[in-house]
Amino acid sequence: MEVSKEEFLRQFGGDYGYPGAPKGVDEMRAAEFKRLEGMAYLDHAGATLYSEAQMADVLKDLASNVYGNPHSQSDSSMAASDLVTAARHQVLKYFNASPREYKCIFTSGATAALKLVGECFPWSRESCYMYTMENHNSVLGIREYALSKGATVLAVDVEEGADLAKDNGSYSLYKISRRTNQRRSKDVLSHNCQNGSLSDISGNNWNIFAFPSECNFSGQKFSLSLVKLIKEGKIPLQQQGKWMVLIDAAKGCATEPPNLTVYPADFVVCSFYKIFGYPTGLGALIVKNEAANLLNKTYFSGGTVAASIADIDFVQKRKNIEQVLEDGTISFLNIASLRHGFKIIEMLTTSAIERHTTSLATYVRNKMLDLKHSNEINVCTIYGQQYSKVEGLKMGPTITFNLKREDGSWFGYREVEKLASLFGIHLRTGCFCNPGACAKYLGLSHSDLVSNFEAGHVCWDDNDIINGKPTGAVRISFGYMSTFEDAEKFLKFLQSSFVSLPVQFNNGYMLNLNSLNLIDNSSQKAVSDIHLKSIIIYPVKSCQGFSVKSWPLTTGGLMYDREWLLQGSGGEILTQKKVPELGSIRTLIDLELGKLFIESPTRRDKLQLSLLESLADLSEEVDVFGQRYEVQSYDDRVNTWFSEAIGRPCTLVRCSSSKYRSCTYTGLRDRPCRDTQSKLNFVNEGQLLLISEESISDLNSRLNSGKGDCKQKLPVDAMRFRPNLVISGSSPYSEDNWKKLRIGEACFTSMGGCNRCQMINLHQDSGQVLKSKEPLATLASYRRKKGKILFGILLNYEDIMEGENETIAGRWLQVGQQVYPSTE
């Protein structure tokens, strides 16, 4: 046993691995989660995993029994109804909720349960919707219903005292501070009132206080004693009226479901895939009877009415609250599968799961806090409650963090995510749909958030650092089947990828993590030895290119290069990262015939397109990597050909012009501004990509040394990187230092290194697309610079002639031409 595991077990052996259960975690992992071999799945806050036995039981159940629509009275329907009833009781039992006091309403998920509360709650102009800052967007969304009825909305910060573990239900243990009141303008409310959507005050006005049992951003657990304090009106910020409490348990219920007998909240929401992985698309609203009677549902549907008449205004809703609130036929087969998911939870017990996952999170958290660069700067900034290594008692099995370089600047979370994927580590990045916690912990002001949005940052994009600040974070989270080996794999990943060691020099190379190797200029070959070895044109973006001996240049670079692209049915740009099948489509241009030839192994007929064809009547605009383009579309014949070739609906468009704009990216980390005077076809950044044979040879020697992850040890050729120009005769990576270069009579400016992604790990072999971690994993070990993995350089063609026609006539590239670089 390794020393680190011995150390871990000495501290956490009583909690880790389910020592009192029929199966320990290692035995369970080997039997039920064989698919996890070689990877560390650390996104259980997003979705935990289903076990093999669970899915086998589900399949056996469905294969052995007949379940009919529970709205019927047949034997199969009654069997389904009985299972639904049993499932309701099992869910209530999980939350220790008495069936006499609570009802279980099945929904399509926690979000649907929250929406149901928001739209059915009796909001009035005297109501207040109060929620903690650390709430999911789905909880924040309820405010739209409250605001539309004239209610006040208030976000609050809740800080818990150090002695809360001795909980005596005292408000003095909390510090609650308010944010700005939110109310709709009088004009909007007046419009709503005229349309009958404002409620008059009649009797008691009702209010809601919402908080998560565990914050999905940071893992901070909120004390459930808030339930009693709110319901007893002991919080000074509470206005008059009756208060209901809503708990978002979507994250927390996987390890510590709220005990509703002890803490009788009015509404609790959950999603079952967060607990045991399957089924997805199924959640529940656990609602107290008194609160359920308040919910006034306007819409009625199949299954919710006792009687209705089609041609007059008559409807009588059912008395059973579950039937009133569950529209249409519920997902009865998914509901029937819940019992198979609960089996393993009941075998292990939630208290043991909580101890197991917390032991892993506490161990990793403490180790992360120990990580320092060679200059003693802390590597990890962890978000959540302020804790020491001894007290982490209020944290769930979630760690959210950002990483710093030795100079104090931030690693972008997308860089962390990209590198983690190469190590087989699955984690989550961004703000996790929790804008309040994200802004609070990252120190982002309202103006920061607005300016980030105006700079182009939206959820799920790659803008991870703006104006020197992170826009999101990295999150790892543990589940009931997580192991020490998962934790150790993650820690080794951090150590090897982000911790800077003292600088050493060896044969002219700087050996320092997170920075690019320097080149020993004394070993560079004579400039006269460098020549152009290959020219490759890629007419259709992400499809195969073709090699030529010579080719004309235009203001956009190589003529017809990346002048076409494919869009999906939703208008999205299709690339090999999304559609690997694009790599099997071959292209060829015959300049004399004026035709583009396209063929696919899945199509017998070849497609021919005229280079001079006018498609002006079908002009439209698209956005590609932040650049607006005017494009021309093709007819159904062409689109059908491509759709059948790649196996999904798509359309082909051709670039007719790009709309130039000034650089708007000055605030973004190391993002090069496009030259607004240069025409760009559908390229990501530069007009051309250049790589050298010597750099490829050096990469292959590293791959063959066994240090990489490439099992087959096959050499990587130039085409894996989709270059336009391949040169020969230089030293490895000497192109990194070039500012300008001349090939023949054509001049180019270097736009810097090309940032590589997982697309270079795709390999076409005998018509199949093979995926591996190489060569990107090896490149990441020595070609990283400020969040980018660089290989090759991007070039822009310097058009020194006036007029595009003169450029076409006067500038050709030819294989064999000398290359004259300049570093000044």
Curated annotation (Swiss-Prot):
Its cofactor is pyridoxal 5'-phosphate. The active site is at 433. Its EC number is 2.8.1.9. The modification N6-(pyridoxal phosphate)lysine is found at residue 274. Keywords: Molybdenum cofactor biosynthesis, Pyridoxal phosphate, Transferase. Residues 655-822 form the MOSC domain. One of its GO terms (biological process) is Mo-molybdopterin cofactor biosynthetic process. It catalyses: Mo-molybdopterin + L-cysteine + AH2 = thio-Mo-molybdopterin + L-alanine + A + H2O. One of its GO terms (molecular function) is molybdenum ion binding. Pathway: Cofactor biosynthesis; molybdopterin biosynthesis. It is an enzyme of class 2 (transferase). Belongs to the class-V pyridoxal-phosphate-dependent aminotransferase family. MOCOS subfamily. Sulfurates the molybdenum cofactor. Sulfation of molybdenum is essential for xanthine dehydrogenase (XDH) and aldehyde oxidase (ADO) enzymes in which molybdenum cofactor is liganded by 1 oxygen and 1 sulfur atom in active form. This is Molybdenum cofactor sulfurase. The lineage of its organism: Eukaryota, Viridiplantae, Streptophyta, Embryophyta, Tracheophyta.
